[in-house]
Curated annotation (Swiss-Prot):
Pfam families: AP_endonuc_2. Disulfide bonds: none annotated. It comes from Escherichia coli O1:K1 / APEC. This is L-ribulose-5-phosphate 3-epimerase UlaE. GO terms for molecular function: intramolecular oxidoreductase activity, interconverting aldoses and ketoses; L-ribulose-5-phosphate 3-epimerase activity. Belongs to the L-ribulose-5-phosphate 3-epimerase family. PANTHER family: ISOMERASE (PTHR43489), L-RIBULOSE-5-PHOSPHATE 3-EPIMERASE ULAE (PTHR43489:SF8).
Length: 284
């Protein structure tokens, strides 16, 4: 019988860097996490995962089976470099090919959710044409994901195009497809001028996972928990009362820290204490 406890995961980039997934999942298990979210970012090293051999993919699956720690989601931020909204046809084609490979990879190793970055373009100036291309590229991507039974979920971003659940819901309603959903980041959501609790309630029924991090206005990464503007307890209470029972993912970038495991353990305890205050988990 499946446990009724809240699934709590950790982002790959919070743990020591490297390509040994057995070691990474063993560490995550030691730290008390249920799952790890894989990163496929714009670096050549992480992009190369999409070209893993059958044996490399099987090694990941075996590590999951051996440890009991799942890898149910992928953070696909490679589209910063190869955006679906690019006005350069070659770059956009690369972006669509990355999407195709990511969906195939997910299908092969059991990843259920691919979190998408809501940028039409990142390093270029946006305009109406980049947004049209982005929307059309997403439509094509959702069609691919539907055939593979892999969910594409839009992150709430550090970027105006997708900085609220309301904006992401516009795309969800436009596509009207069960394989396109939302993956809000309560840190990003709180850093903008949003009514955070109303936004979270508006997304219920479309939220498949939640990123947990702290932020400040204009500062979206590496804000220590408790030093930013996020009202974690209220966010957790709102999600619980709205009926959300899905996973939470602590997002950190401590892979190059002197002691990543210690940093992660500290963050885990801090987040779980706020969850306990919100009535989501038992107090330690």
């Amino acid at each position: 019988m499946l446990s009724k406890q809240i699934p709590l995961g950790i982002y790959e980039k919070a743990l020591p860097a490297g390509e040994c997934w057995l070691e990474r999942l063993q560490l995550a298990k030691t730290l008390g996490f249920d799952f790890v979210e894989m990163s496929v970012d714009e670096t050549d090293d992480r992009l190369s995962r999409l070209d893993w051999s059958r044996e490399q993919r099987l090694a990941l699956v075996n590590a999951i089976v051996e440890t009991g720690v799942r890898v149910p989601s992928m953070c696909l931020s490679a589209h910063r470099r190869f955006p679906l909204g690019s006005e350069d046809d070659a770059v956009r084609a690369q972006g669509l090919e990355i999407m195709r490979k990511a969906i195939q990879f997910a299908q092969d190793v059991g990843i259920r959710v691919i979190q998408l970055a809501g940028y039409d373009v990142y390093y270029q100036e946006a305009n109406n044409e980049t947004r049209r291309r982005f929307r059309d590229g997403l439509k094509e991507s959702v069609e691919m994901a539907s055939r593979a039974q892999v969910t594409l979920a839009m992150e709430i971003m550090d970027y105006p195009l997708m900085n609220s659940i309301s904006k992401a819901l516009g795309y969800a309603h436009y596509f009207n497809n069960p394989w396109f959903q939302l993956y809000p980041d309560i840190g990003n959501l709180s850093a903008w001028d949003n009514d955070v609790q109303m936004e979270l309630q508006a997304g219920i029924g479309h939220i498949v996972a939640v990123h947990v991090k702290d932020t400040k206005p204009g500062v979206f990464k590496n804000v220590p928990f408790g030093e930013g503007v996020v009202d974690f307890e209220r966010c957790f209470e709102t999600l619980k009362q709205s009926g959300y029972c899905g996973p939470y993912l602590i997002e950190m970038w401590s892979e190059t820290a002197e002691d990543p495991a210690a940093e992660v353990a500290k963050a885990r305890d801090w987040v779980k204490a706020r969850m306990a205050k919100a009535g989501m988990v038992e107090a330690a």
